């Protein structure tokens, strides 16, 4: 199909002549005289899209070339452009094919880039998680060096063939349960178990790890004194209470479904009660005539098909169980006694005084004394326990019995030797860099936003 521009069409029309006059010339001569031709021609040209913004008053024989400039120019074919400007034609053709090749190649490049980005991100995540896991193992082994068996058992599990057929969606931290007494364990199901938990000092180290979904079947180990069993006990108790409630006596009551029904039945009941007390026949006849008007009610409400449930609602309720006065008094007094006993138990510090006095001052063994004075226990404890420890320590210092300390004994036992200084400086809780690393791995923070959560001392105070 050959494309022809509007200018080309008008030029051809202009060249057509009949009696040495073109159609357009004849039309333009009679343009002003015949207005109806002007309007029809203008509407036709506007519908065809030939005339838009141009005014037809300027459409004359003299300036027809200027009028033709307002139309779209003729688009030559590629062969004609090759004859006119061969170099420009070649450049445009090469640009056209280059753009098409780039469009085809770009999606593949983007896909490959995205795949590479995904793979690199997963590898980085795995490296980070492994690094975090190693750091946690090291820190836990420092604090709980006596229970190395749990860590060894966990490390040896990878040698088994259980993990070959398991697919896990995400990289997850596994838990390990270590308990020497197998009596206290109950197997919830007979499927394979991949649920581990560290049995570490939770009083010293908080647990921030959450459980995540896994695709494989699990065997859950439940202790006898666990929360799950307590919940089961509560359910059984609730079932027993529900059975006791069902045994209590109940009062049955029927309630009308609507107030209009209730009013109509009251009318009928009142009329029937009056009929029993009346003796005169005239009054009975007058009442019966009134009741005939309401006989439709009897037909509606007392049919064979109608039942009581269609007209009324059962609103029965059980009687409450009577409580003795002694039970109420016991419950009221027991709460008060429990609160009083709890306050007394918290305020009683005799046991703590004895324990701290023995460990800090009265015990003259070298190892125990060195353990409590060479390391700062506040750095290991949690914030809540740290406050308690400080309060108890301040209370014990007021005791005269425990403050009697022989300074000469301390000077003899603890001299400023190089070995002790090196040991205390190398210990992780006193090094600024190690604490920063522990903060990053435990609280998952790269910057120092939560660095205040860990209290540290750059250099510990040495005994003089």
Curated annotation (Swiss-Prot):
Keywords on record: Chloroplast, Plastid, Protein transport, Transport
Keyword set includes Plastid: yes
Localization terms from the record: Plastid, Chloroplast
Keyword Plastid listed: yes
Main location group: plastid
Gene Ontology biological process terms in this record: protein transport
Domain of life: Eukaryota
GO CC annotation terms, alphabetical: chloroplast
Job description of the protein: Involved in protein precursor import into chloroplasts. May be part of an intermediate translocation complex acting as a protein-conducting channel at the inner envelope.
Family: Belongs to the TIC214 family.
Subunit structure: Part of the Tic complex.
Protein name listed in UniProt: Putative protein TIC 214 C-terminal part
Organism of provenance: Marchantia polymorpha (Common liverwort)
Gene: TIC214
